[in-house]
Swiss-Prot record:
Signal peptide: none
Location within or outside the cell: Cytoplasm
Function according to Swiss-Prot or TrEMBL: Involved in peptide bond synthesis. Alleviates ribosome stalling that occurs when 3 or more consecutive Pro residues or the sequence PPG is present in a protein, possibly by augmenting the peptidyl transferase activity of the ribosome. Modification of Lys-34 is required for alleviation.
Organism listed in the record: Xylella fastidiosa (strain Temecula1 / ATCC 700964)
Protein name (database record): Elongation factor P
BP terms from Gene Ontology: peptide biosynthetic process
Post-translational modification: May be beta-lysylated on the epsilon-amino group of Lys-34 by the combined action of EpmA and EpmB, and then hydroxylated on the C5 position of the same residue by EpmC (if this protein is present). Lysylation is critical for the stimulatory effect of EF-P on peptide-bond formation. The lysylation moiety may extend toward the peptidyltransferase center and stabilize the terminal 3-CCA end of the tRNA. Hydroxylation of the C5 position on Lys-34 may allow additional potential stabilizing hydrogen-bond interactions with the P-tRNA.
Gene: efp
Stored Pfam families: EFP, EFP_N, Elong-fact-P_C
NCBIfam families xrefs: efp, PRK00529.1
Amino acid sequence: MASYGMNDVKNGMKILVNAEPAVITDTEYVKPGKGQAFTRVKYRLIKSGRVQEVTMKSTDTLEAADVVDTDMQYLYSDGEYWHFMQQETFEQVQADKNGMGGAEKWLKGEEQCVVTLWNGVPIGVQPPNFVELKITETDPGLRGDTSGGGGKPATLETGAVVRVPLFVNQDEVIKVDTRSGEYVSRVK
């Protein structure tokens, strides 16, 4: 297995920490006035999302993780698994609830996603940045409601709940930012 020296470590690299894949989020090289230089490495565990920090000597190494980000198309969910297909090879993989990481609330079918595979198994799914979903349930809009007057909760066709402006009604299609879970606009 490949390994990285402390001089080669950069943000975004995938490493193994205690046999679990992680992404480096921040590195800081520290050269104190007295003593040996060291590197502070901050990383996020891909499966759990926890952020941790470790201090390493300049002679230490980090093991590279066999983690691949692949563009795939979301096909369907059978209740227990979410199925994805690679467009070029038509190879299919299935992700469980842990592998989805909360992305399932933004997917209705045929969206292009980035699936993170570790040893061929999905451990993370990143949905498109923006999705268009239909509102299935919300309070009715009243006369005089404007965009500046707060908001109301709306349930989308996938089961996700987002805050929308008061003028948005049931059965309308809205655009949602999946990174923040916020309403962006109505779709005409």
